[in-house]
């Protein structure tokens, strides 16, 4: 059977014209159009773009930079360079880092000892800038070297419009004199919503356990509480069911949020940046309302499911042996889609969609299936045809001979 699909769901080209605020207001919120982010992208973890809004516009990542910092550190843990249980003793220098004005942080005191895991928790919870600087210096001995590694990783991932100037995401002018010396003449990092989507997708695929940290709403260290700045977590003031991360960010350029949520096997990552004005409580809360609305509509319109099972199937009038189950993201409101088989015998679902750089449509191997009865039927038809032609020829010859023998 030939299955066909047309895509006219929420996140198609026609609805790309809707701004994030318009989409949010469709969910009964009332936000001013001026609260639109500078850039936004909604993706699945395999890089399928469900919604885009100025996805390649340059933005200030602010503290969402810490997601790259965490990725680099988790890579180090994965390669046994460091361990989550390794201890870091707080020096006077580290204490002073945590006392810088105009920075979100968690107070560190000389003589205290923290594990790398505890310092990592400070990054998504209190958005501690000091914790990321301490970790970078502890691991590489030099914050510049750590920042270099962040930028190399960005290039390897295809984040070609991204540049980091330190591990915290703060403006280098604010963290003086602890800014990376190599980057002291630079100020803020820059990226795009699309590049940060690449980062969050990669981070969650490679290290899904990081969600155990990003979904924490509170933690206690040295009798002091840390509070997660992500107000979209389920029990927070703007909480939404199924949210389990990731990171907020704030700078003079506005308010950012990298949000992730999972429902019925579909994980959706929403990245939005630079909602203005700053400072503004309205804009601060708007980042959560907008991200929540974009995420909810992704769940409303899309699902992740088994499209076709392993085994024999009729596709486009032919029988194929599908080598394994094919799972994919498909629109909920469409009962028709098209299964296409490539010249290399790869089966995939085709509809109007895009992916981030380096990602592709899921596919499975198929093989044409030999059908004995069908082949026998074709052979029988051929034989019958030959016999009929032969009979006609014989009759024609006999008629011809009879006609001309009388002459």
Enumerate the predicted regions with their spans:
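Domain-terminus/edge residues, biased toward the C-terminal soluble/receptor-binding domains
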Residues: 176-177, 183-382, 392, 396-407
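Active-site-adjacent loops and short helices of periplasmic peptidoglycan-processing enzymes
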Residues: 17-193, 204
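Generic signature of intrinsically disordered, low-complexity, basic-rich segments
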Residues: 11-13, 150, 287
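Intrinsic-disorder/low-complexity regions
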Residues: 12-15, 24, 406
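Sec-dependent N-terminal signal peptides of Gram-positive bacterial secreted proteins and lipoproteins
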Residues: 1-16, 379-399
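Generic low-polarity alpha-helical segments
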Residues: 5-17, 85, 345-351
């Amino acid at each position: 059977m030939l299955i066909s699909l047309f895509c006219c769901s929420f996140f198609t080209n026609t609805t790309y014209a809707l701004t994030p605020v318009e989409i949010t207001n469709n969910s009964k919120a009332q936000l001013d159009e001026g609260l639109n982010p500078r850039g936004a992208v909604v993706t699945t973890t395999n890089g399928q773009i469900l919604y885009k809004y100025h996805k390649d516009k340059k933005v200030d990542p602010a503290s969402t930079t810490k997601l790259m910092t965490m990725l680099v550190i988790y890579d180090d843990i994965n390669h046994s360079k460091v361990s989550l249980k390794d201890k870091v003793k707080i020096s006077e220098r580290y204490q002073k880092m945590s006392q810088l004005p105009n920075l979100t942080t968690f107070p560190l005191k000389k003589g205290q000892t923290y594990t790398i895991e505890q310092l990592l928790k400070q990054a998504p919870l209190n958005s501690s800038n000091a914790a990321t600087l301490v970790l970078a210096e502890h691991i590489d001995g030099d914050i510049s070297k750590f920042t270099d590694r962040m930028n190399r990783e960005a290039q390897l991932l295809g984040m070609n419009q991204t540049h980091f100037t330190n591990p915290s995401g703060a403006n280098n002018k604010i963290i003086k004199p602890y800014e990376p010396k190599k980057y002291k003449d630079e100020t803020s990092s820059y990226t795009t919503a699309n590049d940060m989507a690449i980062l969050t997708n990669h981070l969650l695929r490679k290290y899904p356990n990081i969600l155990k940290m990003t979904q924490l709403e509170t933690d206690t260290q040295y009798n002091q509480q840390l509070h997660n700045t992500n107000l979209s977590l389920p029990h927070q003031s703007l909480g939404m069911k199924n949210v389990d991360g990731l990171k907020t960010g704030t700078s003079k350029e506005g308010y950012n949020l990298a949000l992730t949520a999972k429902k019925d096997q579909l994980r959706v990552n929403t990245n939005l940046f630079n909602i203005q004005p700053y400072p503004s409580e309205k804009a601060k809360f708007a980042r959560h309302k907008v991200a929540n609305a974009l995420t909810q509509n992704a769940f409303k319109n899309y699902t992740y499911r088994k499209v076709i099972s392993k085994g024999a199937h009729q596709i486009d009038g032919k029988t194929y042996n599908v080598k394994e189950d094919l799972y994919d993201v498909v629109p909920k409101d469409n009962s028709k889609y098209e299964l296409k088989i490539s010249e290399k015998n790869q089966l995939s679902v085709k509809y109007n969609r895009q992916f981030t750089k380096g990602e592709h449509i899921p596919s499975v191997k198929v093989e044409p299936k030999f059908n004995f009865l069908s082949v026998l039927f074709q052979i029988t038809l051929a034989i019958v045809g030959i016999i009929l032609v032969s009979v006609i020829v014989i009759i024609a010859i006999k008629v011809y001979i009879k006609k001309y023998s009388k002459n």
